[in-house]
Design a protein with these regions (language model features):
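A beta-rich soluble binding module of mature secreted/lumenal proteins
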Residues: 2-206
Length: 206
């Protein structure tokens, strides 16, 4: 059973998503973004991109409401060249949550646009559909990445470590802006060894 603290945390997460949903639509409509969606990075070495990433910030969405903290993505090479995606986090009840899916590289030229699919989610379409995972920012040492989608309604700040340097955070914010998004739409993700609060990224100056 959920205790009162768990229920309060989940309710707070729901209210954040509801409050920001209109802001996301308004902000993306005002963004000075190139037509046809955000520009992916010129080239991704998929072998270097594989491994574990910590989610340090994200645009709230219904599918990640279950996660309270320590959200991570593990990417490994699967059969046929597709990527096996294992997302895990700690829920509001303090229990582990894991979902496993696959990612198919849609843009063979850059390898920066993929189509990610998870089981049990309706209306996803086939693996050869349009991309829904676009890498728009990537550290030269593959220490951080910024990911969105063609509509710019989702967004994730990923890091190899639980915390980023001030310089890397500046690079992350620039990548978000260059993608036609506002860093105020991103909320920091509580991470052991990193940021512990959930606040708009534009107010966090680590």
């Amino acid at each position: 059973m959920h205790n009162s603290r768990t229920t309060a945390g989940l309710l707070r997460a729901v209210l954040i998503v509801v409050a920001l949903s209109g802001l996301v639509i308004g902000a993306t409509g005002r963004a000075e973004a190139a037509p046809g969606g955000p520009q992916p990075v010129p080239k991704v070495d998929l072998s270097r991109y594989l491994g574990t990433w910590h989610q340090l910030a994200a645009i709230p969405a219904p599918f990640n409401l279950v996660c309270a903290r320590d959200t991570r993505a593990h990417y490994s090479l699967g059969d046929g060249g597709d990527v096996v995606v294992r997302n895990e986090c700690t829920t509001w009840a303090g229990t582990p949550n894991t979902i496993i899916g696959t990612a198919h590289v849609v843009d063979k030229k850059t390898s920066a646009q993929l189509r990610v699919r998870f089981p049990g989610i309706p209306n996803q379409g086939g693996p050869d559909g349009p991309p829904n995972y676009v890498i728009v920012g990537l550290g030269s040492d593959y220490s951080w990445a910024v990911v969105t989608d063609p509509s710019r309604l989702s967004g994730f700040v990923l890091s190899r470590t639980p915390a980023l340097s001030a310089k890397n955070w500046r690079d992350v914010r620039k990548a978000i802006a260059d993608a036609g998004q506002s860093d105020c739409l991103y909320l920091t993700s509580p991470t052991t060894g990193g940021l512990e609060e959930t606040v708009p990224l534009c107010t966090e100056r680590s």
